[in-house]
């Protein structure tokens, strides 16, 4: 029975939500696990240049994993052949993959999973299993979207987010550094989080966002950085819709990151596991060390 009265709750927002027509889940890695269960994926080829949480999720689910490399422009070095029941996991790093490249990969391998974690404002391509992560772009603690022609037959529980909101609410009124430990703890929770439907709280907050304004602001910031830093950049970077970040490749990228952090400009180190796992002359290692992301917002 629904409770009535007592005290006021959070307002219900009614704006349009980007990707509302997809399968709404609680995390990006759980999009992959949902897809693996629905499509009976037992083998997958992952890029070395990737968060180890994806690999760990696959291993824990009993999925056999092989790896492949990417080049300096984040393009996949395509395997000559996949096993008959193997899937290829493609990451659209910084939104740099073209629709033509994705379509070509789909035609060549058929069984591909497209990771749009860094490309929330891109539309999915028809017939390509595609996943998006909400918290990489917006002020929510969780949430992800999957596009697929196959759905699970079993009913999923709905996630709850209220207990994970402190670092977001705290940063709104105080310094980000005051709540960084809570942010880190929230990230750790995803490792053991089962596949669930997106929480009602996250779903509601995603209806409060002006996606057109947010996307254009990101594009403006990206274009300003490209005009100022493009001549210094060691890689070619294409303009994209609603970009995740501007990737700047410079030889002293690690020192630049330290300098920016010392001036309270926080440059994340994506996937530090790559530094531990890859040789220091590999493309993946060099990309992680030398790429700074001057702004995301």
Which sequence ranges carry the predicted segments?
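Conserved small/polar residues in nucleotide/adenosyl-binding loops
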Residues: 289-295
């Amino acid at each position: 029975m629904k409770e009535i009265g007592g005290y006021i709750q959070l307002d219900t927002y009614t704006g349009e939500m980007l990707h509302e027509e997809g399968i709404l889940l609680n995390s990006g890695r759980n999009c992959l696990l949902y897809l693996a269960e629905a499509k009976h994926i037992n083998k997958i080829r992952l890029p070395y240049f990737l968060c180890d949480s994806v690999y760990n999720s696959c291993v824990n689910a009993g999925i056999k994993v092989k790896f492949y490399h990417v080049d300096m422009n984040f393009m996949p070095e395509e395997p000559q052949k996949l096993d008959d029941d193997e899937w290829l996991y493609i990451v659209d790093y910084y939104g740099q993959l073209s629709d033509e490249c994705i379509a070509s990969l789909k035609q060549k391998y058929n069984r591909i999973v497209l990771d749009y974690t860094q490309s929330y404002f891109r539309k999915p391509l028809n017939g390509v299993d595609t996943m998006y992560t909400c918290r990489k772009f917006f002020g929510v603690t969780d949430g992800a979207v999957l596009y697929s022609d196959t759905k699970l037959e079993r009913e999923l529980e709905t996630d709850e987010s209220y207990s994970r909101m402190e670092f977001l609410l705290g940063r709104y009124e105080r310094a980000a550094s005051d709540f960084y430990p809570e942010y880190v703890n929230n990230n750790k929770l995803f490792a053991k989080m089962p596949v669930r439907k997106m929480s009602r709280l996250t779903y509601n907050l995603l209806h409060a966002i002006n996606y057109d304004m947010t996307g254009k602001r990101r594009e403006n910031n990206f274009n300003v950085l490209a005009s100022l830093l493009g001549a210094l950049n060691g890689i070619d970077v294409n303009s994209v819709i609603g970009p995740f970040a501007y990737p700047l490749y410079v030889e002293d990228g690690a020192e630049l990151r330290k300098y920016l952090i010392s001036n309270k400009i926080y440059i994340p180190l994506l996937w530090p596991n790559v530094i531990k796992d890859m040789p220091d002359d590999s493309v993946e290692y060099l990309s992680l060390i030398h790429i700074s992301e001057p702004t995301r917002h």
